[in-house]
A protein has these predicted regions:
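Alpha-helical subdomain
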Residues: 1-72, 82, 173-339
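Conserved Class I S-adenosyl-L-methionine-dependent methyltransferase catalytic core
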Residues: 14-22, 26-29, 34-35, 40, ...
């Protein structure tokens, strides 16, 4: 469990954390890590590459140094290993666009709503649900394109953790632009998938599916997952990041619906921000749950023991809840009994 804070400096580290976030985002918006990937640079060289004044570039680089993203030696700045692996455009595991576009441009300002959301007094015109948010086609597109990059890592983890070798039909409820479905279909040549998603997201997703050459195996049903008819007799049902974005009062019925739409022997997979039952963390899971509360005030903080019990109560066997993205998400799985 977390060691409790004792000093004012530790509290300041939490209170001023937003400054480090913005330093990272500003560097991403200016392509700084991508330029530094070529090799160490002075502040003047980095500024020239980014089109920024050298002194302001030095101030930004110093902040990045202080938070551990870049190193400084003899006046030259270089990416750390983490920056090179994850923040450089075109790197294999680059998720800079997800951080820059979704987290900074969308999640960051939405967190301004947290006080009102906690008091359940979001003003008229505030974003009060994903349905509100994604009614705007531009917002849906920005979110979806950045989320697609952010979902590929979890999708690869899901391939490793869920046995879908005998599955033919996958239902992906709230499947976004298809990062999960595409990755699963690529790993399992006999699998086909149906994704239920908001129309503005489905439009973006169809293009990703086509680009992957999978339009014959992955189809979309346009609609709100909570109100749309799902196809039955599925071999697998997936809900990834659905629960954190819907009212907590819908959770039990969604688990029952998954059971009802599976064939006997079918597998239910639920991937989301899940904390430990003792409420001690993990830190990123807990913070992401709070983030979702800012624009889904009816959201509920999921914990592993509750999920396991809810799967059991719905009739699933072989129930397990295990960490997926380390320190952030968990994958709950259950099988509908029978052959």
């Amino acid at each position: 469990s977390m060691t409790l804070l004792t000093t004012s400096e530790e509290i300041s580290n939490v209170a001023f954390g937003f400054m480090g976030s913005k330093a990272l985002f500003a560097a991403l918006h200016n392509g700084l890590f991508t330029h530094l990937a070529v090799g160490p640079m002075t502040a003047e060289e980095a500024g020239l590459a980014c089109g920024l004044h050298p002194e302001r570039t030095r101030t930004l680089l110093t902040a990045l140094c202080a938070i551990g993203l870049v190193s400084s030696e003899n006046g030259r700045f270089a990416n750390g290993a983490g920056a090179n692996a994850f923040l450089v455009k075109g790197a294999k595991h680059d998720f800079g666009d997800y951080l820059r576009l979704q987290v900074d441009r969308q999640m960051y300002p939405l967190f301004e709503q947290i006080e009102d959301a906690l008091a359940n007094r979001l003003p008229d015109g505030a974003t009060g649900s994903y349905a509100d948010w994604f009614a705007d086609a531009d917002e849906a597109k920005l979110y979806s394109e950045s989320q697609h990059a952010g979902s590929l890592g979890p999708a690869r983890a899901l391939v490793r953790m869920a046995d879908l070798s005998n599955a033919r039909r996958l239902l992906d409820v709230g499947g976004g632009t298809g990062a999960m479905a595409i990755t699963l279909c690529e790993a399992h040549p006999k699998l086909t998938a149906t994704i239920v998603e908001f129309p503005n997201v489905a439009d973006v997703g169809r293009a990703y599916v086509a680009a992957a050459g999978l339009s014959d195996r992955i189809e979309y049903i346009d609609g709100d997952a909570l109100a749309t008819e799902w196809p039955a007799d599925q071999d697998a049902v997936l809900m990834s990041y659905l629960f954190s974005g819907v009212p907590g009062s819908t959770h039990e019925s969604l688990i029952s619906s998954a059971y009802d739409h599976l064939s006997p022997g079918g597998r239910f997979m639920l991937h989301d921000f899940v904390v430990n039952a003792d409420r001690s963390g993990p830190k990123l899971a807990a913070l992401w749950q709070l983030q979702h509360t800012a624009f889904t005030p009816e959201a509920r903080s999921l914990d592993d023991a509750w999920l396991e019990g809810a799967f059991d109560a719905a009739g699933f066997s072989n129930v397990s809840v295990k960490p997926m993205i380390p320190g952030m998400t968990m994958l709950a799985q259950g099988v509908r009994p029978g052959q």
